[in-house]
């Protein structure tokens, strides 16, 4: 008697069970906040305030953009004044003496590290961090 190889297709259940046993990667949740600064500053000045990250920072001075490599993804600071060009925003910025606005984008899994970075920046530059709907 010859040995026959089982040529039957695996059942859909078997394939699904195998997939569910594999490690599932978490879905990235990118967050955006805004850093409102009451003084003129540049992205290079901000980078200098983060000595522990000097080897993890990339700067694009012409775009006023800084990218920091964190544990799960990157944290990006990007000048965002044009996001707040309407007169209501401008009145708010004038009343609160806001001179510079950066959009901050990061992975939710890096939130604790982001809080430490923002705390360091705020200690030197003051200002506040908020979501877009919290600004006015």
Model feature map: region roles:
Residues 1-22:
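Intrinsically disordered, Lys/Arg-rich low-complexity segments
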Residues 4-6, 15, 31, 68, ...:
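Intrinsically disordered/low-complexity terminal segments and short unstructured peptides
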Residues 16-18, 26, 125:
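Intrinsic structural disorder/low-complexity segments
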Residues 26, 39-109:
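Short, intrinsically disordered low-complexity segments
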Residues 26-32:
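His-enriched metal-coordination microenvironments in redox/metal-binding proteins
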Residues 35-36:
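Sequence/structural signature of long amphipathic alpha-helices
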Residues 98-132:
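Short, compact, well-ordered microdomains
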Residues 134-136:
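Short acidic DE-rich linear segments
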